């Protein structure tokens, strides 16, 4: 009877150990690799609080969180771009970028490409500055919730007319 309990305990250890290996997202191992590379496990990293986590905790509404997340993802893309030629962390960076693509962009390549295009614009480029100022009024109109509500009401009104005719 004693041997049976040892065998069962051993099997449980094997099962739990294998679950830890196979259930873990691939980015976790690569993030740990980056932590080692950047010495991000050192105690002084916690000085002066967190960069992103407190901000994310402050925002509960999905739309607000998406805004904050987009800025954070933009930061990581810029960080990864600075180290794109470092072969020691290349695999880790690519794995994490791919996981961001799945989680944040829902594997939508067009959405990711447009996002990267936006993050790559240089604010010191005079042509970019001129175009941005030229488009400012239209961009501000798109940001306004009133403009979106007006569009929605008009489209509902037209749908209602078509249905009644």
From Swiss-Prot:
Name the UniProt key words of this record, in alphabetical order.
Antiviral defense, Cytokine, Glycoprotein, Growth regulation, Pyrrolidone carboxylic acid, Secreted, Signal
Give the signal sequence positions. Answer: 1-23
List, in alphabetical order, the Gene Ontology terms for molecular function in this entry. cytokine activity; type II interferon receptor binding
Task: Name one cellular component (GO) term.
Answer: extracellular space
Q: Which residues carry this modification: Pyrrolidone carboxylic acid?
A: 24
**Localization of this protein:** Secreted
Please give the Pfam families that the UniProt record associates with this protein: IFN-gamma
InterPro entries on file: 4_helix_cytokine-like_core, Interferon_gamma
What the record says about family reads: Belongs to the type II (or gamma) interferon family.
Q: Which PANTHER family match?
A: INTERFERON GAMMA
Q: What does this protein do?
A: Type II interferon produced by immune cells such as T-cells and NK cells that plays crucial roles in antimicrobial, antiviral, and antitumor responses by activating effector immune cells and enhancing antigen presentation. Primarily signals through the JAK-STAT pathway after interaction with its receptor IFNGR1 to affect gene regulation. Upon IFNG binding, IFNGR1 intracellular domain opens out to allow association of downstream signaling components JAK2, JAK1 and STAT1, leading to STAT1 activation, nuclear translocation and transcription of IFNG-regulated genes.
Q: What name is this protein filed under?
A: Interferon gamma
What organism does this protein naturally occur in? Macaca fascicularis
Q: Which gene encodes it?
A: IFNG
């Amino acid at each position: 009877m004693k041997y049976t309990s040892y065998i069962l305990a051993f099997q449980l250890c094997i099962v739990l150990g294998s679950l830890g290996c196979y259930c873990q997202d691939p980015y976790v191992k690569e993030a740990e690799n980056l932590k080692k590379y950047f010495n991000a496990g050192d105690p002084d990293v916690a000085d002066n609080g967190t960069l992103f986590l407190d901000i994310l905790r402050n925002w509960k509404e999905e739309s607000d969180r998406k805004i904050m997340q987009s800025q954070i993802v933009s930061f990581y893309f810029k960080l990864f771009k600075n180290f794109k030629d470092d072969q020691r962390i290349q695999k880790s960076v690519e794995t994490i970028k791919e996981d961001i693509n799945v989680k944040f962009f829902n594997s939508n390549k067009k959405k990711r490409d447009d996002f990267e295009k936006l993050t790559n614009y240089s604010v010191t480029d005079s042509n970019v500055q001129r175009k941005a100022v030229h488009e400012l009024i239209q961009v501000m109109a798109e940001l306004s919730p009133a403009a979106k509500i007006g569009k929605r009401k008009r489209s509902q009104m037209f749908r209602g007319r078509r249905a009644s005719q």
